[in-house]
Regions:
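Conserved pre-ATP/AMP-binding loop-to-beta segment of ANL
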Residues: 19-21, 135-156, 162-163, 189-198
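Conserved AMP-binding/adenylate-forming
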Residues: 32, 49-94, 201-202
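Conserved AMP-binding A3 loop
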Residues: 33-36, 152-179
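Conserved AMP-binding/adenylation subdomain of ANL enzymes
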Residues: 175-198, 205-274
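Conserved ATP-binding loop and adjacent catalytic segment of the adenylate-forming AMP-binding
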Residues: 225-227, 297-360, 364, 369-372, ...
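Gly/Ser/Thr-rich phosphate-binding loop
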Residues: 245-249, 258-330
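Conserved ATP-binding/catalytic segment of the ANL
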Residues: 361-417, 441
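Conserved C-terminal "lid"/linker of ANL adenylate-forming enzymes
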Residues: 394, 410, 438-441, 466-523
Length: 523
């Protein structure tokens, strides 16, 4: 049987699109519309352009897309896959050093770029700017058969050069995931599916959540609207002006919207009336996922007629669970495993026992997971074994309830997984003379705990602040807690990471606290 290529996803999403307008956006204040036919013409033209421009780049190798969302992003993706290149979706917030690191380890010889300053520092054979692609004449036709379409792509998690990770997915896996998402009849009916016409594309298409939800919404026949930027005021203005019915966002985006509603209506409580006064009447439904939604945010949703989908997934697993906040009264309810998918789910308790029900760390296996991960030794295929998600869930009659994170993982408000051990490496050099230091989770934020009786506190604070600013925003610690007394340790003599929050709460008067990010910690 022939291997599934991205031609199948292209057919399902684009060729079989049943709506009238595929993409919309504002340009110089005027609305621009792309029909399905125009989108396909642009994709074919870019395919012809890439076939000539990348003729010295071997087919079957990797090409990086390192650019922000734009109406052209998806055309670029499909055009490259159509030409026989595997697309690596790089984080557009990466530095040139990070892009070069991935290019070297993955063998990337060409990069599609939209940042001229970063582009000057890239070390690749072919560098193509998105501004040049927008000038490609839309009259070329690139004929290809399925044998030239590629079979894989890769999502890259954000982070520093040392800890960013790249996961490869097969075209078959992604196509199946999109199919199972769109096959949820209950979800379609509950989200007012037949009344939705236009969704706002604000999540990065390079991310599995942004990519997967956009593809699924196109399968439903909805128009994707690309805003000028993703500032909260622009989002609100676009929802009103462009008649947006659906929006996918992480909790931080929804919280920002509700904050504006509260300010503009001078009301602490979100009501249907106050929400519509600011947002208008067009928004009917949406998704709030990518991170755990706080109880206050869920209460705000429940005060509205909006039907908001919760859910769960990771870069490594794609979208695995789907559920509505209104389906269950529990604030910890996450949803059900995607029906029909190839996911196998189990739990591992604190003693290492694995079972199919109960409470414990969520384990997942199946073809819907990533197929390979990039290491310093190159791409390493995933073994057919349980993948440890780092999340604790309880399974009650196939309903999944989020109970917390595994001890070593911190999840940020924007949905990023932070690994304390990796963060500590960033501070090792400047804290080499400190007797004890450890990064732990406090109020869902990474905090640096220190015991340094002999250190000059002012100098130490300045070093930490400078080092923290060197990290990407989602990787920065929220504060520093300097203790007058030794930190608790394990039987191995190591700082007891999982007792630090409790230790701080019981001994606050012996701590000097330094806030590094305003609004993150409530002290």
């Amino acid at each position: 049987m022939a291997e599934v290529t991205f031609a199948k996803l292209y057919k399902n999403v684009v060729e079989d699109f049943r709506g009238d307008i595929f993409i919309e956006y504002f340009e110089n204040g005027n609305k621009v519309q792309w029909s399905k036919e125009k989108f396909m013409q642009i994709t074919d033209s870019l395919s012809a352009y890439f076939a000539e421009r990348l003729k010295n780049v071997k087919k079957g190798t990797w090409v990086g897309i390192c650019c922000d969302n734009s109406p052209y992003w998806v055309s670029i993706f499909f055009a490259l896959e159509k030409c026989g290149y595997c697309v690596a979706m790089l984080n557009c917030s990466f530095t040139a050093e990070q892009v070069n690191s991935f290019s070297k380890n993955l063998g990337i010889e060409a990069v599609i770029e939209d940042n001229y300053e970063r582009a000057e520092k890239l070390d690749v054979k072919e560098l193509i700017m998105t501004d040049d692609l927008k000038k490609v004449s839309v009259n070329s036709e690139y004929n290809t058969s399925d044998e030239y379409w590629e079979t894989k792509t890769a999502f890259v998690t954000s982070g520093t050069t040392s800890n960013s990770k790249l996961y490869v997915f097969s075209a078959e896996s992604i196509t199946e995931q999109i199919y199972y998402i769109t096959a949820q009849k209950h979800a379609y009916d509950k989200m007012y599916g037949d009344k939705i016409h236009r969704f706002l594309q604000i999540l990065p298409l390079r991310h599995c959540l942004g990519f997967g939800t956009a593809m699924a919404l196109w399968v439903f026949g909805y128009t994707a609207f690309f805003p000028d930027n993703i500032g909260v005021l622009t989002i609100i203005d676009t929802i009103r002006k462009a008649d947006i019915n659906y929006m996918v966002g992480v909790p931080a985006i929804w919280k920002a919207i509700f904050s504006v509603v509260r300010i503009k209506t001078k009301s602490k409580v979100i009501t249907e009336q106050s929400f519509r006064a600011v947002m208008g009447d067009s928004l009917l439904s949406g998704i709030c996922s990518g991170a755990k939604a706080e109880e206050t945010l869920i209460r705000d949703f429940r005060n509205l007629s909006l039907e908001i989908i919760n859910g769960w997934g990771m870069t490594e697993t794609g979208i695995a669970m789907v559920g509505f906040f209104s389906d269950n009264t529990s604030y910890n309810y996450t949803g059900k495993i995607l029906k029909g998918s190839d996911y196998k789910v189990a739990f591992e308790d604190e003693n290492g026992n694995i079972s199919e029900s109960g409470t414990g760390e969520l384990l997942i296996n199946g073809n819907c997971l990533y197929s390979a991960v990039l290491t310093e030794e190159g791409l390493v295929p995933r073994k057919d074994e349980w993948f440890h998600t780092g999340d604790i869930f309880e399974n009650i009659d196939a309903d999944y309830y989020f109970k917390g994170r595994c001890k070593s993982v911190i999840i940020t408000d924007s949905g990023e997984n932070l690994y304390p051990e990796e963060l500590e490496e960033s501070f090792c050099e400047i804290l080499s003379d400190v007797p004890q230091f450890c990064i732990a989770c406090y109020q869902n934020c990474p905090v640096l705990f220190i015991y340094a009786p002999e250190a000059e506190k002012t100098v130490l604070e300045e070093k930490i602040r400078c080092q923290n600013q060197e990290l990407m925003p989602d990787k920065r610690i929220a504060g520093v807690f300097i203790s007058e007394n030794p930190l608790p340790v394990t039987t191995k003599g190591e700082s007891s990471r999982f007792k630090l929050a409790e230790f701080f709460e019981s001994n606050k008067k012996y701590f000097n606290t330094i806030i590094l990010q305003k609004g993150k910690l409530n002290l």
